[in-house]
Amino acid sequence: GFARLNTLVKEWAIPVVEYWGTEVTLGSDNPMLAGSDPEGWLSAADVIIVIDSQAPWIIEESRCNDSCKVIQIGPDPLFSRYPVRGYRADINLAGETDEVFELLQEALQPHVAAKQRQVAEREKHVLNLIQHAKNQRESLLHANQNGAIGKPWLSYCLGQLANQHQGKIVSELTTMPQFAGLTQADSYYQEALAGGLGEALP
């Protein structure tokens, strides 16, 4: 679903936040990549689409509007095997993410012409917010470069190597993907919230 999602969010100016992402959702060259912090985006959103995420934000720290519609997408969007999960789900779309994105594109296509002005206005607003966050990350990346290597700079260097050699970063809380600048699908993997319990690599 990487390519289809990248196209869909650009066409409709939909900002994407990768909160605790275990893989690359959008390439860093996609203008709609809004970083890793949902704070600010949640409270302003009228619709939130959660893509196959068991914990899309920390409920105690960030909250969405009561009037906001929350759409959960994934093979099991309710995570039905979990005894308790406190995230809202106004609409659930069960299925493989790539297939759901394809159906969403088809459903939205007839509305492209009528929504052009609205999308253009949203795009301008979203890009301003994203640029502000990028400037903050750039400042942090280049701050205190006095010989010591911090996580942001290490992540940036690893990302440059991965992009250059079509490599893959496998990380356990070491790499900060928001600084890595990865542009390709399958170029990053981080253990799930269970800390790699029951996982293995070939």
Residue ranges and their predicted role:
Residues 2-16:
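Redox- and metal-dependent alpha/beta enzyme cores, enriched for Fe-S-associated oxidoreductases
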Residues 3-7, 59-63, 157:
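A short acidic, amphipathic alpha-helical/loop segment
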Residues 1, 37-40, 89-96, 142-150, ...:
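Catalytic cores of large soluble enzymes that bind and process phosphate-bearing ligands
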Residues 18-127:
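Glycine-rich, acidic loop regions that bind phosphate or pyrophosphate groups
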Residues 10, 64, 163:
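Anion (oxyanion) recognition and catalysis
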Residues 16-19, 50-51, 93, 168-173, ...:
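General beta-strand structural signal in soluble alpha/beta enzymes
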Residues 5, 127-202:
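Active-site diphosphate/adenylate-binding microenvironment
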